[in-house]
Every structure is written in structure tokens, then in C-alpha cells.
Amino acid sequence: MNDKKLMDRAADNIRILAVSMVEKAKSGHPGGAMGGADFINILFSEFLVFDPEQPEWAGRDRFYLDPGHMSPMLYAALTLQRKFTIDDIKQFRQWGSITPGHPERDIAHGIENSSGPLGQGHAYAAGAAVAEKFLAARLGNTMMQHKIYAYISDGGIQEGISAEVGRLAGNLGLNNFIMFYDSNDIQLSTECGAVMSEDTAMKYRAWNWNVLEIDGNDPDAIREALIAANKEEHRPTLIIGETIMGKGALQADGSNYEHSIKTHGAPLGGDAYINTVKNLGGDINDPFKIFPDVQKLYDDRAAELRKIVAERHAAEAAWEKENPEKAAQMREWFSGKAPKIDWSGLVQKRDIPTRNGSAACLGVLAEQVPNMIVSSADLSNSDKTDGFLNKTHALTRDDFSGAFFQAGVSELAMACMCIGMMLHGGVITAMGTFFVFSDYMKPAIRMAALMRTPVKFVWSHDAFRVGEDGPTHEPVEQEAQIRLMEKLQNHAGQDSVRVLRPADSDAATVCWQMAMENMETPTALIFSRQNVKSLPEGTDYQQTRKGAYIVTGSDEQFDVILVASGSEVSTCVAGAELLRKDGVKVRVVSAPSEGLFRRQSKEYQEQILPRDAKIFGLTAGLPVTIEGLVGANGKVFGLNSFGFSAPYTVLDEKLGFTPENVYKQVKAFLA
């Protein structure tokens, strides 16, 4: 046990580094970092187990920061661990630095997740805890015996996702999940009492959490709480630490600056900064100095960790020798490579909903990808993720031998937890719901794109053909929204999300193949509720891989090209037949992914959709969904309003999504 005086000094060193980063950058959030320094110091110098030489070691404990604005606290602690240099943290918030304003995933430097909108970070942690339990059920406790730590703030607790995660983590009994709640009662514009008055401890106890309430600035109390949390066998643990915003801060006149809203989101500034550094024992002429005894504390912990990890590695090596097949499997799972899948035995039925085609694909994956977890937001029998569920069983408390995560009606938590499972490593995740409910998931989709986490989003009921449920459940603008993510590039220059909307069940197979092969970015798969007429016999479905391809009319001169995705392709095919009877030469193109199509050669793009061609686009979404493919000389028939409640066949007729109206629209276009 380390001396309390030393631990206080180490926390003060973290505070000095944090406020100095913010001061030098002229922006940032010092107050919360100052209040949380005691917890992060105890956790990082006494509890967190990792390999100083192998940052990606699968058996490491993982720490997920939810309030990313508290990055100075995290960067300071990681600097004491020698994962950042003083020069690194002096470049806080600057162009090209590895210390951005909010942390971005960087395993080599000890950062497990990008910290985005409040609430998501601790959901990643809960997902990681599920992944660890899932893998332990398959590999055993020698390889999987680590803890998942999360840090959440008042703002994160206020976010609705905290209730979703609280319920799910408690229901699953994730005793490997330990979360510190930094309760300082201050947020950016008010004290927390202005917006919250509930009993947070009681709330989490009701969700089956082990709740410990402590002084969050007392190192002895923090240590005791972490020891107790590590011993918990049946429940996740919430450590509620009452902390002091801006602990140790002084104003310009030397008076107390603690518990002030002003310290939350701006540099202390001028004499307040000088007085604070001095008050904490720092040298204002060298504020980035690390105290020698504090550095020794962390170096001693690193030496201790090398011994701990050496014993763990020896046990792992013995396990690998005794279990060569499992060891090879584990290496493959953590490699980040796409799994090997034999699709040859899958024969799709014709003229079925593409969601049913997806279900058949998921059945193949359930049999051949043993490290895959699929989830649904209480819709497995409708979004047809039950194609996977029917060949496994759900994860439950004390039984993680299954591979289906029942998320209940919690779309955002489901998405974030599935992302967290993949951030942990060793698993592949997919999750399903209705396309209209993707709106609940947008913050998670964006963060998955930013972190390049290759989760699979499965969205069924893709258009107004949801029918009788009416406009609240009929997606119109959603496809345009998600396809914007194909136009947004990630920092590796890739389309940030790969979006695929197949034309029929056989195309759905190829889209699932591509989704499973894509281990670099998220993939969105969009499927129909209703039956979809299969494409003509002889269609080369592997052309789906090019994002857009000719379905009919490839060998003739054409007067017009009809282009669509998903259900609308078969409508175009039928409309083309009517046009041909009238002497019009027609080419039909299926475009499941404009982003993928734009990644093809200019020659291929010109071959499929020549720029000077007359192109007619059909979309059940907003016209803008397909305008990029139609071009300046083209015409789009889409939906400019919300849908209506009626059988989908009636809606097709009323809204103009029939072969006859395609004929009418194209004839007018060519006139």
C-alpha cells in the first residue's frame, strides 16, 4: 500500500499537468480533470494490469473514458506511465498532435476508445465486459481474466443511454465491469442540482449493481472501493465518488476557486493559474515538470507489472501448449482479419424479402463464425436476425456460451455495446432493428465510423412499404442520411461507412460476404420487409462488389438508363419491359452502394453510367438519395413526403412505385 502523502502528491502532479495543458492550449476543461485526479492515480498506479512492452496484449485490463473533455487527466496519467512524452502533452489540442482535445483511440498510447458524446464511452466499456465474458466461456479464465474499468461524469449519468446500459449490465451480471462515477455536482452551465435530484445509488441498485459510495478525493477510500469491486462475483460495480470540481484551484486574488462552474470549460488564466500551480506544489517556471517521487511511483508499478505479466504470459504459454487448436483460434480472432466463410452451400429462395435472404446468411455465419455476436433491439423475428439466433442462444447472466445479445428496446446502447465488444477485440458483432430506428443510433454510427470499428448494422423494413404501421415507422429520409456517411471520409481516406442495399436475396448474399470481408470500416446493410422479385436469370451477382452494375440491357445501344437500389430495382426491370414494348432501348442498373461504385475506375463508372447518358433514377427515399448517380442530365422519381398507413401494395400504387408509372415517367423524360 502506497503512502497517502505520496498518493496526494501524485494526484496533485496530475492536476498541475492537466491545468498546464489547458493553459498552454488556451482552451480545454481543467476543473473535472483536477477533481478526478485522485481516482485515476490510484487506478493507474495500483490496479490497472497491462503489459508495458505489449500494449495490445489481449489479457490487459481496459479503461474507457466516457467524458472525453477530461482528456487532460487521462493524458497526464498516461504521461506518468511513460506512454506520452512531455512534448506530446505540450501539444495538447494542436494540429498533428497525438493529444487531441477529446481522446481518439490509440492502443499504443493506452487509449482504448475515442470519447465522443457523453454516455457512449461507458457503453463501450459494458460491451467490452460482455466480450470478455463471451471469450472466457470459449477460451477459459487463463486467457480471459481481466477487468473492464469505466469513468463516467454527471453529464454521462444524465444521458438516457446510461439507463439502457445500467439495465443491461445489471441484468447480465457483468461483475468484470467496474465504473467510477465522478460526482462533482458541476456541469458546463449550471450546478447539477438544477437539472437532477434523483438518488443515483438507489437507481443503480435497482438495476442489480453493487454500489459503493465514497469520498472520491480520498486515496484510501478509492483503494478500498476498488479492492471490493474486484472481489464482486455477481454484479457490475458503480463507485460513486463525491469529488471537488477544480480541486486545489485558487483565484487570482488567492481565494478558493474550487466547486466553481467557471473551472469546468475554460483555462484558469493569469494569476489564477499561477496561484493554482503554486498551491499544488508545482513550479510555475516549469509547470510540466514531473515530481521525481511520483515518477518513481509509476516506474515501480511498471516493474511490478512486468513481474505480474511475466507470470501471466507463462500461464498463457502453458495453456497454448495444452490447447493448440484453441490457441490458434484465439490468435485468429484477435488478428483483426476477416473470418474464412464457405458460402457455397447457401442457396437463396427467389422472390422473397431481402430480410429473409439476410436471415439465411446469418444462419451460415452462426455455424461458421464462432466468435460472432449478433444483437437485436427486441426485433429479431422481424429484422430476421433470428436467422442467427435460431442456431445459437442468448447470452444470459452466468451463461455466456450463447452468441446472441438480447438488447431489448435500446437501440443506442445496443449499437454502442456492440462497438465496445469489437473495441475489446476477439469478436465480430452485428446488430439489427428497423431502418427508421437507425435515428436512435446515429451518434454510435458516427463514432464507429470515426474509430473505424467494423461493426455490421442490419436494418430491415427499409422504405414506405412497411405499410400499415404508417409514417412513424416508414423510413424516407434515412437512406439519404446514412449514404452521406459514404461521402464522408475517415482519416485513412476510406468511405467512413460502407452502405449496401441489395436488389434481391442473392444480392443480399454478396452484400453479407462484403460486410464480413470489411474489417476496416462499419458496414450498413439495408433490407426490405416485403417480397422482392428476383433479378433476371443469369445476373452476375458478384458484380454487386462494384457498387453498381448492369442488370439488363448491357449489350444494346440504349436510349435511357434506369438506376435504383434495393426493392426499386425490380420495379425498374418491370418498367423497362414496358418501355421495350414501346421501342425504347433500356439499360437497368442496380446500385447497392454509390460509395463503392465511386471507388471503381473512372473507366468502369463511365461504362456503367456514362456522363452524357439520359439516366432515370427511382428511389423510395428522398430524391437526393440517388441524384449523385443520375447526374445533371437525369431525372429522379422519389418520395418528397412522409409515408402513409395502408397495405404496401396500395402505397406502391398511390405513390407511383409501379412499372406503369416508371414507364410514364421515363416517356415524359425522353419526350
Each model region followed by its residue ranges:
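Residue-level marker for buried hydrophobic side chains located in beta-strands
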Residues: 150-151, 179, 375, 616
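Non-catalytic, alpha-helical, charged scaffold/linker segments
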Residues: 277-308
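Short acidic, Gly/Ser-rich segments with clustered Asp/Glu that frequently serve as metal-coordination loops
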Residues: 155-161
